[in-house]
Amino acid sequence: MAKKGNISSRNLRISDQIQKDLAEMIQRELRDPRLGLVTLQSVTLTPDYAHAKVYFTVLGADAAETEAILNEKAGYLHSLLFKRLHIHTVPTLHFHHDTSVEHAIEMSRLINEANATRSKDED
């Protein structure tokens, strides 16, 4: 997932609006039973607003399959965004599974395991 360091306030506002609109559209417009519970984590835009990386997590479905489905439906979602957003360029959407949550869970598990081992060694 990209950092929001040197990004213009306009870029951030548009990213946030795209994230909100896409989250609603995925829930209401995409009625694909293969999709699980999709949560959009962030949207990062290129400086020219031509491309948007949309990072998501999913529960109840395979992440790779969900990514493929979302990228397959990206054109449809783009057309819906075009109708909602009042900007000159609506970015091309690129969906990516966000693995940072899984990494955080794994790191937490490893820390807890190390602490448990240390406690046993001290006893």
UniProtKB/Swiss-Prot annotation:
Cell compartments where the protein resides: Cytoplasm
UniProt-listed GO biological process terms: maturation of SSU-rRNA
GO molecular function: ribosomal small subunit binding
Main location as per UniProt: cytoplasm
InterPro entries documented for this protein: KH_dom-like_a/b (IPR015946), RbfA (IPR000238), RbfA_dom_sf (IPR023799)
Presence of the UniProt keyword Ribonucleoprotein in the record: no
Subunit field text: Monomer. Binds 30S ribosomal subunits, but not 50S ribosomal subunits or 70S ribosomes.
Task of the protein: One of several proteins that assist in the late maturation steps of the functional core of the 30S ribosomal subunit. Associates with free 30S ribosomal subunits (but not with 30S subunits that are part of 70S ribosomes or polysomes). Required for efficient processing of 16S rRNA. May interact with the 5'-terminal helix region of 16S rRNA.
Family: Belongs to the RbfA family.
Record protein name field: Ribosome-binding factor A
Native species: Cupriavidus taiwanensis (strain DSM 17343 / BCRC 17206 / CCUG 44338 / CIP 107171 / LMG 19424 / R1) (Ralstonia taiwanensis (strain LMG 19424))
